[in-house]
A protein has these predicted regions:
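Residue-level recognition of tetratricopeptide repeat
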Residues: 15, 46-51, 83, 116-120, ...
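Alpha-helical repeat scaffolds
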Residues: 36-40, 67-79, 101-111, 134-148, ...
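Helix-coil-helix junctions within alpha-helical repeat/solenoid scaffolds
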Residues: 236-435
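TPR repeat positional signature
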Residues: 19, 37, 52, 87, ...
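Internal metal/ion-chelating core segments
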Residues: 142-241
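Inter-helical turn/loop elements of alpha-helical hairpins
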Residues: 17, 22-39, 43-101, 127-139, ...
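TPR-adjacent "capping" and linker segments in tetratricopeptide-repeat scaffold/adaptor proteins
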Residues: 2-18, 75-85, 149-150, 154, ...
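Residue at a conserved register position within TPR or TPR-like alpha-solenoid repeats
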Residues: 26, 59, 94, 128-131, ...
Length: 435
């Protein structure tokens, strides 16, 4: 066996290991070259377990069911006598089977033994994000950091991951510090840039957030997997200040391009922005229809409820209410099925399905029903994944529904909560003025 760039043993030829190491660098920088380097590693040595595992993880991290099914073929029949490689194969198998929590625990176990396994750290971090588990999003990285040499060339990327975990746990100043330290290590660390951007959004520092993202645009606005999502953050900063023109310009330039309407996670960004504009009664023209069509072309399997909810946003926004109701019906059937997927079934039953029902009620103009469904679970939405900033689209929906339903006292509570967290929020102040 040879050693990877962190000093851990792995099976594979020298050429395969070299390509694998380069692939890991691209993975951490969210660069599309990760796919080519992974394929090169697989081609150099098809028996290289870590290369095959990385390829499977790339499919799983898309959050789309067909990619998860396809991921199985990369590890089918693979075994390893090496404990670390065997744990990776186990985690992949659990994830493909729908036990995302089981995969997370297996990766925790793996990192307890091998805290310098950079693939487990990176993949586990994304899995924590998909599961909405903020504590482990922070803890998984924090536990590993003492085992790393700060002079290691990959160390900065760990700080970027730590920054996002700290931010999701509400430690905004510490998150900004860690994120900026990560950027000092690697100017192209778009995950760290995005994490610092989150801290500005959560603190209500919208002008500062725009200035920061503009100052880092040479890194994030190029070809990388976070270009669309970081553009979305910039649009959200504009939206918080009710600068609808700027938000729509970003939507047209980046979020609604043919390229971005191919992957579920980027389509979710587009729909999330358009729905926020919809709540503010901004005319978005024909922008909903291409997005709704893109979602309609996706596999309908209930695999990740976060995506299902954003599909409903697009269908309701496009006036395709019947299709939105059909998605809710599929979700209801999935929850009742004895074969339901473990993790997604839990997320769907506890929060995802009620939110889906609330969104379709909103589409019907039944704002009382929207509030009655969503209000009891408004603090439980993290279970279906995403960040605080992403899930805020549902909190906004609740607030607008309450206002339209004439529930003045509840709206006052929701507005006060928002203004305490984001004192500079023009949007929250405007909602209060509507009363």
């Amino acid at each position: 066996m040879l050693k990877d760039q962190t000093g851990l043993l792995m099976a594979g030829s020298e050429e395969a290991v070299a390509h694998y190491n380069r692939a890991i660098g691209h993975l951490l920088a969210f660069q599309p070259e990760v796919v080519g380097q992974t394929e090169a590693a697989r081609a150099a040595d098809p028996s290289c377990v870590m290369a095959q595992a990385l390829r499977a993880y790339l499919g799983l991290m898309s959050s789309e069911y067909p990619d998860a099914v396809n991921a199985a073929r990369f590890v089918r029949g693979l075994t390893s006598s090496d404990a670390r490689e065997a744990l990776h194969l186990s985690a992949i198998g659990q994830w493909i089977a729908g036990d995302w929590h089981g995969a997370s625990r297996t990766l925790d176990d793996l990192l307890g033994r091998y805290p310098r396994d950079i693939l487990a750290l990176s993949v586990g971090h994304q899995l924590d994000f998909f599961l909405g588990e903020a504590g482990n999003l922070r803890g998984r990285i924090t536990r590993a950091l003492p085992h790393w040499d700060p002079n290691h060339h990959l160390y900065g990327y760990l700080l970027g991951m730590q920054a996002f975990g700290l931010e999701e746990c509400g430690q905004y100043e510490a998150a900004e510090k860690a994120g900026r330290a990560a950027i000092a290590h690697h100017a192209d660390d778009v995950w760290a840039i995005h994490a610092v951007g989150h801290t500005y959004e959560m603190r209500g520092l919208f002008e500062e957030g725009i200035d920061f993202l503009d100052s880092q645009s040479a890194s994030w606005a190029s070809s990388n997997f976070l270009k669309v999502h970081t553009s979305w953050h910039k649009a959200i900063f504009a939206l918080e200040q009710q600068d609808y023109g700027a938000a729509l310009a970003i939507c047209d330039e980046t979020l609604s391009s043919d390229q971005s309407l191919r992957t579920a996670l980027e389509m979710a960004d587009a729909g999330s922005l358009l729905w926020r504009l919809h709540l503010d009664e901004v005319d978005v023209g024909a922008r909903w229809e291409p997005l709704a069509e893109a979602w309609a072309s996706k596999d309908p399997t209930c695999w990740y409820v976060f995506n299902d909810l954003h599909t409903i946003l697009a269908m309701v926004g496009a006036g395709r209410q019947a299709e939105a109701e059909a998605i809710v019906a599929r979700m209801e059937a999935s929850v009742l099925s004895p074969e339901r997927l473990v993790s997604n079934g839990l997320a769907m039953a506890s929060a995802g399905l009620p939110v889906a029902q609330a969104l379709t009620a909103f589409g019907r103009g039944d704002y009382e029903q929207t509030v009655s469904i969503m209000a009891p679970i408004r603090h439980q939405l993290s279970i279906f994944g995403g960040s605080h900033a992403q899930r805020d689209v549902f909190q906004r929906t609740l607030l607008v529904a309450a206002r339209r339903a004439g529930q003045t006292a509840f709206v006052q509570i929701l507005c006060q909560e928002r203004l305490e967290a984001r004192p500079n929020s023009v949007w929250a102040a405007a909602q209060r003025r509507h009363l």
